[in-house]
Amino acid sequence: METTAPRPLAIITGASRGLGFETAKALALRGFDLALIAKDSQRLESAAQVIRDAYTQQHGNSDLRTSSFICDLEQPEQVRETIAAITHSLPVPQILMLAHGVMSEKMSKTLKTNDTEWRRVMAINLDSVFQLVNGIAPAMADARNGRIIIFSACLGRMSGPGNAGGLAPYRISKAGVNALVRNLAHETGLGARGLLVDAICPNHSRTDMGGSDAPRSAEEGAATAIWLATRPFNPAGTSDQEKLTGVLWEDQQVVPW
């Protein structure tokens, strides 16, 4: 009797649209089963069906397994419940892809941001990221085979272009993501023990957040995340692309932050 090797699992947040959807679809086509997380149940189920149809069209079968989890990532209790549901019902993931996020109000300079707006943006962009990593990554670290990829932003850089102020909650939340990634990567051995932790700047892409006039498509914005999920890694390698983790990537290049 023939047995088939279990397919690797990828968990993707923000999976119902934009960068999260494009990342989820690309990983499915590359052989990953999916755990999809989003707030809107109708949109998420529609996205999951599009992904399943694309998989069937490319592979000629319906072997892809998708699981959907409805979660408002602004609500810590919902995040905890979603983590529990995933960890109790699914195997240890190989990929944890955190592609969700929210923009702050356009006039949200530091001294003009109220408590409600600050907490909303931090809850979604940073607190939920910490919760998801803290709840799911320990098993990945124990398995010594996993990749955590978090969508950050060039607006979260403290050096280089795009650091002139404004959009305070958004910029600061993304700077926090960059710091979390660096800290966790160092704590887990910078890839030497099998766990890679990276942040990406997808650049201005045509999504609900980025708007229809953005220069990049959502597929282009997701490309570096997909590469990070599948790249060969060797901590003794010669190029940044094969040996570095714990950094911020843009177009498959390391950028200072």
Feature annotation, model-predicted:
Residues R30-S46:
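Conserved glycine-rich Rossmann-like NAD(P)H-binding loop of the short-chain dehydrogenase/reductase
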Residues G191-L195, A199-I200, G211-W257:
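C-terminal helical subdomain
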Residues Y55-E77:
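Rossmann-fold cofactor-recognition segment
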Residues S16-R17:
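Conserved glycine-rich cofactor-binding loop
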